[in-house]
Amino acid sequence: MMFSGFARSIAKTLCVLSLGGWMMACSDDYKWDNENPSYLNSSIYDCLKEKGNYTNFIRLIDDLNYADVLAKTGSKTLFVADDDAFKTFYASNNWGVGSYEQLSTSQKKLILNSAMVNNAYLLEMMSSTVGPEPGLCLRRETAADVLDSVPHFNGDQLPTNYNPDDFDYWARFRVPSKGGIYMALDNSNQMMTHFLAQQMANKKITDKDFSIIVGQERSKNDAFIYDSKVLEQNITCQNGYVNRLDKVLITPQNMAEMMRTNGKTDIFSHMMDRFSAPFYDAELTARYRLLYGNSVDSVWQKRYFNSQDYRPLQNDQGTDPTGNPNGNTIKFGLTFDPGWNAYQANSAVTKEQDMGVIFAPTDERLYEYFFSEKGGGRFLLEAYAPEEMANVKGLEDKENIYRAVDQIPRDVIQALINNLMKEQFCNSVPSKFETIKDDAQDPMLDETHLDKIQKVLLANNGAIYLMDEVLTPAQYAAVSAPAYVSKDMRVMNYAIQKLTWMGTAKNFYAYLLAMSSRFSLFVPRDGFWYIDPVSFIPKNNNVTPRAIYYDWNEKTDAMRGTSYPITYDFQTGTYTIGDTPMSTGAASSTELSDRLNDILETHTIVHEDKTDVSGIDETATGVECDQHYFLSKNGAPVYVKNAKQHASGMEVQGGWGLQHDESQKVVRFDDKTRETNGNGNGMAYQIDGAIVPTIESVYSALYNNQDKFGKFFELCEADNSEILETLKPYLNKDAEGKDIYTNAEYLKRYAIFVNGGGLPCFDKQTGTIVTQATNVRFFSNYRYTVYVPSDAAIQTAIEAGLPTWQSINSYLELDKEPEQRTEMTEAEEEARNVKAAAMVTALMNFLKYHFQDNSVFADVPALAPTQYETATLNSETGIYCKVTVSSSGNGTLNVKDTAGNTRSVLDNFKNQLVRDYVIASNQISASSFAVMHGIDGVLNYKTLTNGRYDSDWNTTGAAKRFIKNYQIKD
């Protein structure tokens, strides 16, 4: 017999046994060489004939010329249905077939080939992949071939697209004279999905999962092929195995076709089909013509544009081989191709190990989503299809529903579809719902969604959960959604979605998708001005300020930034923007992106719960609360007034606006909060211009207010280099006498202001540049508060022994010529220098103590006493010295120092907004924002002994101890 080798191999598996250390071996004249064991049936074909109740299946085998294969050769695994199962099938099936005689050849092939695996497998081994790797196999190939069924589609059966801006790939085939199209629904072969105990255990698919997905209960060792139960397992034949099913196995179609034909997901299927196209398949055409003759000119396959890593389709080459042979790049796409029979999630997971999942909303739910007053997708139709939406008469008015939904651009509607497509079935069973993430990587489902599952459809390449809920993507629920769909906020949408900054994709859209955050997003309409701070840096000794006009170029469909010159009057703070774009000195594309990044972060406020400090939980109120000042993502203060009036009077200002009496009005308001919509993360406000931050630095604010704060500015700004050189052995030596820092680093540590790439300080009376050394040395890309004591307060401190650079200079006699200085012994000079070093240490720590981490404003709400760190470090403890800030509300602010002194902010200098820029290669590489307040007294980082500063160095020993405790280390 031709299959005797297979039979012999089965018998010989019992030949060698090892049990309890005993081995039984086979001789060469083993009896099963000439005689079959009793459990071994004849061939698969003969076995079925002998049993007598498989006449329908035998007819399939005979009609398709498979009798010799299944009677004389091997090896096969067959899943068969008996005549009783066929009787039930004829009574009710989707094909409308009432008897065997009514089956077409294609249908016969589908039944037989889909039930046949081209190898002999024990059922329990079918859960193993090649290796073998037990418990990994969910699906496997069968004898089915794509040519078993290549249907013909008439024009009215093909996808339609009502969006005039979309290229309709199907249009030419819908023309009646064309006569339709012969099309494979995919050019890969259908696979068999089986639920076997070992694979389910390995992938932690529970019996409850199975019952929800398949709609049946299972016992421990049950095996199912799709929803067909194996009633009789592993009937062993001489050329393979037969398994009897409880019903006729009809391999289901792929997910795309199943959604198109099940009658409950027509709208969702239509939405997905907008991403499909017919692709000419030369190989399939040749095979078809070889098999069926030359009556068919061409065979096409239906594919879906997708961005899957493993098998992406992002070019339409092949849709028009003659007219456009090279095709075009496609900018939209689904998560994966739902029509791909041989679906594979990625290179690490084979097609046998997993399949896809779609959480498809029913027609009823999608209709509510788009057309009900509170539907989560209504804003899309309001933006793109207001007229078409008005024409829809109800759920049954499918054509007008399609017409309306199709107006939503594909690169917008894909967010909804892709959120509902998950790449791995084994990780998406009901028991794992809480691990499934949405497009923001937040939890998308929980156990309550089990009640939302209307039914599960098993396709040949995945599972479809029919959902009584539309799981809206974060992209639609987030504050960025209005910009995402609006036609007049495209510049900001570009910044959110596609901006590249410093050579790296910003991916700000992902940040704004966080549903656990609460945002207020301000979005200027296209056509807004931005005062470019970098343009105030002199080039070739000239300053040419410019404003950038951001708008959307309709011709190129791209963001555009045009530079215009500014005429600026520093004395009055007024300016005019020129009418003609700059021919030289215009911002480059890199600079445009850089400033757009600054705009993006300035317009985004991330709210926090500040109940403990101000009594306001901003995560609940957003900006609609009893305060005016808020900090944006990059630390820029934003002033908000009339917040609850929305588009009827709400205004916002940045530092530039406050200093130039300009404001941006809210022209549209979108509530995207979770409280209102069930999912969301804040409020979106469209404004009529950009919020522009200040260009004034801490240095500039002090320099140009010397009439009030000249003494503090003088202490911060004075040249102390000669003093530091003299005291270097006392301030920059370790215990072994080695330098702690390089000379440059040492000198920098005793400076308040440095040249760190910041904007120059302009004298507001003359307009001339004072200096470019304007950056606070210890600011570090954060937000701060600077307290500025009045001249009277500084003078009182000086009278109490606070050293000044001038007094230290005089104490060291550096203001005298060398020959005029007092002669001292080495010990006397040592003692003097130690005391002078203590004075320097005291003065530096005094100044730094007025620079506080975190920005605190004199605003409407009262503030509970709250401690904040300053820039002064107790080097002995390693702890930064703190101040305690409080307010009784209504614009007041009090600061209490370590010594217990409470100072109040001055009404004539409070809430002054400043910013220290760090500019590199004409880009804003970093910046620090601060708010400045004048105060009516100085702040002391320690309690004064006898009310005097100089008590800390009245002896050499005291001076040394003081230096040790407060040495300047950063």
Regions found by a protein language model. Give the residues of each.
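Sec-dependent bacterial lipoprotein signal peptides
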Residues: 1-26
